[in-house]
């Protein structure tokens, strides 16, 4: 059994001639790691701006990983900044929530695309992670989706027993059927959210912001959204 887990531009998938459909979000993702003055308290934070979405994701200690989904004009500007200017921009865009920031890794940018993979399997082949799907990072679900792929593939193989053929077509079809619905739902959700948050219609923007404020004010609703994301 060959497992393709080699990213959104998967060489394994291409060699297997598995069809892919994709479209560009006309945005770039800019990633970097920072050390923070204040504790992140293991909370992932996002800020929605007219020209992009900034996310700071907690790492160990006082480290965070930044993902800034920016339109092409904004990403070009950010890529031209010095290290000190990048820190200042992120501090301002995050409302100084984590205090002073220090850049730990050089910012890297990449184009953001929606990638739909027609089949998750081939002859003695299974795709997992970004090789099996490519979604917008705004919901922070790409890693979770890939981990669920891996968990389902492993559990499907284990359930068949030690003496079974792990590359058996029917076994791989069982894995594919089990994962398709969740992947399609996440692709639809992230695509819809991206369209919602990139829309600059004033009325829609006000309604969207009101929805975020109300969600933040109701802990039970937030917990349910978190649980849904984890499951």
Would you name each region that the model predicts?
Residues 9, 27, 147-150, 179, ...:
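Short amphipathic alpha-helical/adjacent loop interface patches that line ligand
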Residues 22, 58, 145, 181-185:
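A generic short alpha-helical patch detector that favors 3-5-residue windows
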Residues 14-15, 138, 157, 203:
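Short, function-defining helix-loop hinge/capping sites that tune catalysis or transport
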Residues 1-107:
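Conserved FAD-binding catalytic core of PHBH/FMO-like flavoproteins
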Residues 155-231:
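C-terminal helical "tail/cap" subdomain of flavin- and related membrane-associated enzymes
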Residues 74-169:
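FAD/FMN-dependent oxidoreductases across multiple families
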């Amino acid at each position: 059994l060959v497992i393709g887990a080699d990213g959104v531009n998967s060489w394994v998938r291409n060699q297997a001639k598995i069809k892919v459909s994709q479209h560009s979000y006309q945005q770039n993702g800019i990633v970097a790691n920072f050390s923070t003055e204040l504790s992140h308290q293991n909370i992932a934070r996002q800020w929605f701006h007219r020209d992009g979405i900034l996310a700071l994701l907690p790492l160990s200690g006082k480290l965070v990983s930044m993902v800034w989904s920016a339109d092409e004009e904004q990403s070009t500007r950010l890529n031209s900044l010095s290290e000190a200017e990048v820190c200042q921009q992120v501090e301002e865009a995050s409302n100084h929530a984590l205090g002073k920031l220090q850049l730990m890794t050089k910012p890297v940018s990449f184009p953001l695309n929606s990638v739909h993979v027609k089949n998750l399997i081939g002859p003695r082949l299974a795709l997992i992670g970004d090789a099996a799907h490519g979604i917008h990072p705004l919901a922070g679900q790409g890693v979770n989706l890939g981990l669920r792929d891996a968990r389902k593939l492993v559990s499907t193989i284990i359930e068949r027993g030690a003496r079974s053929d792990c590359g058996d077509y029917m076994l791989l079809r069982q894995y594919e059927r089990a994962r398709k619905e969740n992947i399609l739902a996440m692709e639809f959700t992230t695509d819809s959210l991206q369209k919602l948050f990139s829309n600059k219609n004033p009325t829609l923007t006000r309604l969207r912001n009101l929805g975020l404020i109300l969600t933040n004010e109701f802990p039970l609703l937030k917990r349910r959204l978190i649980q849904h994301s984890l499951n």
